[in-house]
Amino acid sequence: MSLNINTKYRDDSNSWVVELSGELDVSCADDLKKELDSNIEKKFSDVKVDMSNLQYIDSTGIGVIVGAMKKLKSGDKDITILEAKDNVKKIFKITGLDQIIRMEG
């Protein structure tokens, strides 16, 4: 399975929403990194990552999320994970990232 990435900017909340579906692993993590980096540089707003349709994430995918978080925090912005499935939430909990990255839903 592959990763699908849809993005949209929300003026009302000054946030950029990234919708992920499929699997985020080593084979496609670079695609997400490029998308995040490009949009962080352009808009530099808060980022909300909708993971409601993400089936799987590996350590490479986690690394991309952490890298984006660091770039955002350096500009006083934030990243929020939305609606992650239980198996994806478990990875964030095991790594302790649920204490660092805001998770909703």
Q: Residue ranges of each PLM-predicted region?
A:
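A Rossmann-like FAD-binding core segment of flavoenzymes
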Residues: 3
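Amphipathic alpha-helical interaction surfaces in cytosolic regulatory modules
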Residues: 26-100
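Short acidic-hydrophobic, aromatic-tinged amphipathic segments that line or gate anion-handling sites
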Residues: 102-105
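STAS-typified acidic loop motif
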Residues: 7-34
